[in-house]
Amino acid sequence: MKQGIHPDYHAVQVTCSCGNTFVTRSTYNGDHMTVDVCSNCHPFYTGKQKILDTGGRVARFEKRYGKKAK
C-alpha cells in the first residue's frame, strides 16, 4: 500500500439518542459520534415495524390477486 494516501482509521465511541453507546472503528474525524437511531431502538430491529399502506395499494393488490394463506 502507498503511504500517506489512506484516511486515518481509528476507534470511535458512538452514542445514540436512546442512550445506547458502543465503540466501532471509522474514518470519522473525532473520537465521539452522536446518532439518532441505532440497532437498539430502530423499529426494524425491535419488531415494532409497521407497514404503511399508501392509498390502499396493498388492499387493492390483495383484492385483485388474493392474499395467500400460510
UniProtKB/Swiss-Prot annotation:
Gene Ontology cellular-component annotations: ribonucleoprotein complex; ribosome
Gene Ontology MF annotations: metal ion binding; rRNA binding; structural constituent of ribosome
S-S bonds: none
Binding site residues for Zn(2+): C16, C18, C38, C41
GO terms classed as biological process: translation
Keyword annotations of the record: Metal-binding, Ribonucleoprotein, Ribosomal protein, RNA-binding, rRNA-binding, Zinc
SUPFAM superfamilies listed in its UniProt record: L28p-like
Cofactor binding, note field: Binds 1 zinc ion per subunit.
Domain of life (superkingdom): Bacteria
Cofactors demanded by this protein: Zn(2+)
Annotated NCBIfam families: L31, PRK00019.1, PRK00528.1
Summary of the function given for this chain in its UniProt record: Binds the 23S rRNA.
UniProt record similarity statement: Belongs to the bacterial ribosomal protein bL31 family. Type A subfamily.
Assembly and interaction partners: Part of the 50S ribosomal subunit.
UniProt protein name: Large ribosomal subunit protein bL31
Source species taxonomy: Bacteria, Bacillati, Actinomycetota, Actinomycetes, Bifidobacteriales
